[in-house]
Curated annotation (Swiss-Prot):
Catalyzes the reversible transfer of the terminal phosphate group between ATP and AMP. Plays an important role in cellular energy homeostasis and in adenine nucleotide metabolism. The keyword Cytoplasm applies. This is Adenylate kinase. Monomer. Residues 30-59 are annotated as: NMP. PANTHER family: NUCLEOTIDE KINASE (PTHR23359). Residues 126-142 are annotated as: LID. It catalyses: AMP + ATP = 2 ADP. The gene is adk.
Amino acid sequence: MRIILLGPPGAGKGTQSARIVEQFGIPQLSTGDMLRAAVAARTPVGLQAKSIMESGGLVPDEVVVGIVADRIDEADARKGFILDGFPRTVAQAKALDAMLAAKGLSLDAVIEFRVDEEALLGRIAKRAAETLARGEAVRKDDTPEVFKTRLDAYRSQTAPVSDYYAQTGLLRPIDGMAPIDDVSRAVEVLLRGLQPVSA
């Protein structure tokens, strides 16, 4: 089972990803973790990424796709994987599809957690107010202003990926505003429907 999780910051991708890992025994692949691991392992692609990152550049799509390609060849990913945080652009989505096709693989589903952005902003503002009321400092990335910037970036850069996968027939929208357990149940039903029935 090879799946991608999409959704804006605060949509619950991390929570749902952890539950999928637990229920289905497939690894969550984070591009950030994979980049760091490839650099630490001094793989050819990792060394290429390291020199780019050290010079302050953005790691090009082909390098990131190369790192994903290496990672999905590992034993724990043979039954499948969850990609979270990648692809972020349509170009990356197309590169991922081409890489998987070259390996004789394809994605099974792209789950998009749909949320009400105003409600998300309200949650963040409430959390910030509660943190301040406890006399604690609000993390810089947890303020409504920063969160709105992250939402805007998601909308402009990553939201088109949703349209791309809708055109391929892989997109499976789920209501990310429902209670966490309801979202988990919806994800589980969807994923169980993807599993082949044993004879």
